[in-house]
Every structure is written in C-alpha cells, then in structure tokens.
Swiss-Prot record:
Function: Serine/threonine-protein kinase that acts downstream of ERK (MAPK1/ERK2 and MAPK3/ERK1) signaling and mediates mitogenic and stress-induced activation of transcription factors, regulates translation, and mediates cellular proliferation, survival, and differentiation. May function as tumor suppressor in epithelial ovarian cancer cells.
GO biological process annotation, one example: regulation of protein processing
In-chain residues carrying the UniProt-annotated modification Phosphoserine: S218, S377
Family affiliation: Belongs to the protein kinase superfamily. AGC Ser/Thr protein kinase family. S6 kinase subfamily.
Name the record gives this protein: Ribosomal protein S6 kinase alpha-2
Binding site for ATP: 65-73, 91, 421-429, 444
Means of activity regulation: Upon extracellular signal or mitogen stimulation, phosphorylated at Thr-570 in the C-terminal kinase domain (CTKD) by MAPK1/ERK2 and MAPK3/ERK1. The activated CTKD then autophosphorylates Ser-377, allowing binding of PDPK1, which in turn phosphorylates Ser-218 in the N-terminal kinase domain (NTDK) leading to the full activation of the protein and subsequent phosphorylation of the substrates by the NTKD.
Residue ranges of every copy of the Protein kinase domain listed in the record: 59-318, 415-672
Amino acid sequence: MELSMKKFTVRRFFSVYLRKKSRSKSSSLSRLEEEGIVKEIDISNHVKEGFEKADPSQFELLKVLGQGSYGKVFLVRKVTGSDAGQLYAMKVLKKATLKVRDRVRSKMERDILAEVNHPFIVKLHYAFQTEGKLYLILDFLRGGDLFTRLSKEVMFTEEDVKFYLAELALALDHLHGLGIIYRDLKPENILLDEEGHIKITDFGLSKEATDHDKRAYSFCGTIEYMAPEVVNRRGHTQSADWWSFGVLMFEMLTGSLPFQGKDRKETMALILKAKLGMPQFLSAEAQSLLRALFKRNPCNRLGAGVDGVEEIKRHPFFVTIDWNKLYRKEIKPPFKPAVGRPEDTFHFDPEFTARTPTDSPGVPPSANAHHLFRGFSFVASSLVQEPSQQDVPKAPIHPIVQQLHGNNIHFTDGYEIKEDIGVGSYSVCKRCVHKATDAEYAVKIIDKSKRDPSEEIEILLRYGQHPNIITLKDVYDDGKYVYLVMELMRGGELLDRILRQRCFSEREASDVLYTIARTMDYLHSQGVVHRDLKPSNILYMDESGNPESIRICDFGFAKQLRAENGLLMTPCYTANFVAPEVLKRQGYDAACDVWSLGILLYTMLAGFTPFANGPDDTPEEILARIGSGKYALSGGNWDSISDAAKDVVSKMLHVDPQQRLTAVQVLKHPWIVNREYLSQNQLSRQDVHLVKGAMAATYFALNRTPQAPRLEPVLSSSLAQRRGMKRLTSTRL
C-alpha cells in the first residue's frame, strides 16, 4: 500500500512531512527500512574547544518566526557567553510529536548543518536537547526569502538572475562535495541576508546517498521542482538538484513554472515527458543553459559529469561571473532588502510574529526518548559578535507594524511623548522617551489621511543603515496616525549650527559638502531621490559639530525608482529597460537634490543665500532670480574664497539640470579632492535669523510649484497571485 503524505510548510525556515495514518503499519515500516531509516538516532557529541555548552536558559525569546505541529521557530537573543547579544533563529522540535521519519530528518538536518560551513548556506551555531525537545540555533537572516522578492518587490533581468543562480551553484556544489543531495530547492528555501546575498536553508529533506551507486530512492521535495528520476522513484543522485536549479532559473526569468499541470498527477506527467516550450524572449545563452539542465536522463544533465559544477560555471550564460569574487562576496547583489534594526522581522509572516514567544518545557515522548537523540549537543567553532540593541515594545494595523508588534500595543504604551521638535504640513515631530529604558528618541507622527508613509518607511528601512542617514528605530500605527521612532538629533540643524559658529572656514565647508554629497551619491546610485533636501532636513546627531555626525532626515517626499507596475527595479533593469522619460524624470529629481546642495554650499561660503535677500522677499521675486540663474560670486567673502569653490558652486547651481554636476561629479571635483589645502580663515556671515528667513522663503517659493505625480507600489504581482494558494501572503511595505 502506498504511503500517503501531506506537506506542511512553515515559511522560510522549516518544511516537514506529516504522515497521514496508514492502514498498514507493516508497509509503512518496510518503506522506512527500504529508505535506510532506523529508529535509533545516534548523533555524536560536538562541542568545540573554548565554547560553553548551550541550553535554553541562555536564550531570550523575542518573537515567533514560524510554528507547526512539530514545534516553533523563534527569534532569540543570546544572553550569556562570548556571543551575548547575538541574534539567532532557534528551531525547537518537540520529541513527542516527531514521527520516526521526522526524527530522522531532524537528526539529518543537525548533522548536515554541523558539517557545512559555506558563505551561502545557513550556519548552525548550537544544537542541544532537553528531556522533551530538540534545539537548533541557526543564523537569523533578516532579508526574508527569495520568493517574496520574485513575487512582490523587484523587477529582475537575466543579469540579476545570473547573480543569484551563481551563488546558489556554489552552495549546491559544496553540499555535493560532502555527498549531500539537497532535494528541496525552491525560492522559499533561499533566504537573503541584509546585504542581499543568498543562504539556502531547510535541510529536513536533504539526504546523504545511501547505496553504492550514491543513489537515494525516497519520494520527497516540492512536486513542481522534482526531477523525473525523483518522480518515478528509480533512484536519484546529486544531478536531481541541477534539474531543480533549472526549474528555479526558469521561474525567476519568466515568472512561471516550466512544468505545472492542473493537479499533482498532471504535473508529474509533464515532468516525466520533460518537454518544454522555450520562451523566445530569453537570451540564447539562457535557453541553452535551460536545455542542458532539463535533460530527462540525469546522466546527460549539465553538472552530472565528472567535472560537476565546473560544467555549469563554464557555460556561456555565466561568462561574466568572476567566481572567486562571488565566493568572497565582493560582487554587489542586485537588490538590498529593506531591513531596520537587527531584531526586525518585516519579512516574516505576521500570523507568527504577532504571537507571544513562549517555549513550554515539552512532554518527554517516552522513558527512553533521550537515547533516541544521543549526543545532540553542538557548539560552533567561531561565534561572530554583533552589537546588542535594546528590545523595543510593540503595536498594530500598517503591514510593517503588524510584523513588529501584533495588534494590541500602542505607541503610548511604550513611549512618553514630550515637546514638539518641528511641525510640517503632514506631520509633527516630537521628542519621546522609551518608558522601559528612559532612552530618548524623536517620533515623527504622520497623518495617514494626508500622506501615505509607506515609501518613506521602506526607504529608511533599506538605506537607514548608512552612517549619514537617520535611523528608523520603530514604527507604530493607530489607524489614523503612523509613528516613526527615530534617533534624536541633539546637535540641531546644520545651517543653524554653522551660522552660530564663531569660526567657520572654506575648509570646513568642503568637509560638510563631502559628507552630504557622498550620502546623496549613495542614494542616487540606489535609485532614490530625496526631493526635499533643504538645510532644515540636514541635522547633527550630537553637539560635536563633526561632519561624521551629520544625518540626512525627512524622506517624506523621497522616491524610489519603480516600474509602471510599481515594482522596484535593479540597476541592471533600469539601465536596459526603463523608458527614457522615466529616467529623465529621475535624473531631474537627482539634479534638484544637487541644486539644493548648491544652495547650502553657497550660503555656507557667502554667509547669505543666493536668491533671497530676506524673509520678506515674495515667491515671485525669488523664482525670477532662480530662473535667471544669476547670483553674486564677488564681493564680501567671495574675494577671499578659492576659484575652485566658485567653480563647484556655479556648476551645482547651473540653471539647466542636464548640465548640472551629479553627486558623484561633485565628489570628484578638485575643490573636494584637494580640500586639505583649502583656507582655514574665518568667513563672515549675515544675521542668523535673516539668513534662515531667506532660506525658508526660498524653499517656500519652490514648494508652491506642482509636485511630480507619485508612483505607489502595487500590492501584488501575477507571480504572487499565481502561487497565492500555495502559501500565506507575504507582507510588503
């Protein structure tokens, strides 16, 4: 009698198979014996020298990342030992609920992870057991899984897909070198770190070859990704992984699966026929690689030969890949996930992350259960420390907030609101105090009826790790307002501080411009334009006045470059497929950012603004002066300022955006490159209030002009809709 199985998936971390009750226990047992599975599970002790043995008391539970009948996956923080403060994913398996096959898979996953050490494979740091449970302590990867990216966020090109496939090929080759067949390759099992590099996870279905031909015979994996030899159960080798590799490549390039019928039976029939209609929009190299991977006979499949992965690496599709640089992570990923604090779980299912993290002791399965998992303990040889950050409270409604807090905690439960810091058209900024720690922050309170804060939040999450961009600490939503908790800028506004400074020189002005231009170049290179870079949005983190403490703030008008369907675009996609008028608009917005920096630089050097004489100038007068492109570069401070400074100012304030310097050109200008030789003589300035009033009048005049139409992200894509019934919907920002 055939053994019936039902698949249960806990997203991103763990897949197990729950066995339906079979009418014939003997047939089930014989099937297990055929697959080389025994009841006794013996796992050797593995404690590396210099590290203490771990136990559950050493880990603080922060959030639930996933849950099933077998147990849970938690986000945890180590509270003792040399790696105290480090965040991990803790997989907790209840011995009593694990069937024999699942116990074997748990043992197998632990064994494989303990043996594997590779940049593109999730790392096991500890393994241990109590009377009722097994524990695996793994890397916590904040970038979510590749499926989310494929379906909801980014437009990929062949060049981008090539990057992910190349990293994946190196990971598979490493496993194959250890005699391991992965057998469950699919986007859900490919996680992204915060930089966008991949790590494959979920080794519950992986298997070391069992017979002298290095073949395995069990029927496992996700049906659409199975190789023909897995479907027909005639035994499979590592070559089966290269078929799945081809399925993943096809899906990433086309948005659909190559072999998918209306039901399981039809899908299996299509796989066994291995006949594929090749999309003609794919490059000749991509088509060639797919044909070489989709060979029905595994012996003829690319990667199955004596050279193994070298056959794949030599294929023309990968001709542009530098494999050594790739392994060292020196090639920049095409996409950077939006991640904030280390403990953020934006890319995990809110059904799980909203739950209170509790780990019950677990009921021992039987008197001799402990012996079934002999020697489960393991400690990694090296533990990389990350800076510990405070755990911040929790809240509701906006998708991002769902991920952080659940449904029942409000901003005022965790923070006490203090005085106003600043007031804008759509928001107010206040000082606030975290009740549990007395730490001070700034909270930006946005009226949702006037502005959708999603774009601002996503930009801050994705790029707020830059040292000169304000850091988003937490997000709350009460339905009417969104609360963005950010670091408090104690040093005040840049221009205010400079104008009140007793001594300010041309050399200091160049240091300030260098820091801000470098930050804008970073944003522009990522397809982000600020569009509101007035001096009041450039602040100091502290009272030092050091350029390193400068932060770019208020991304309320900022935009990420998106396709017409609202998806983000990789740099490669932008260069090859974006309409000229879209790029022109993006270039115009970037040029406006540089123009704003030109206004700031002019004011720092001259001591007054270029286009407004004071707060009483009318918008019409100011706009007329801006349109003429005329401003003074002689008299006053200008008589002692270098020609290089005048040159960079005039090129940043050029009336034609296309002739204006870009941020990267500003950084390469001699005035910046040779700034250590600039004068340190004190520059004079007008009255502080007069200058600030003139600056405010300038931006008031500019903001009266119509804003460009805003592109909003779509909530889903065809790929997400196609696979929507197969898994829970992923959250997008």
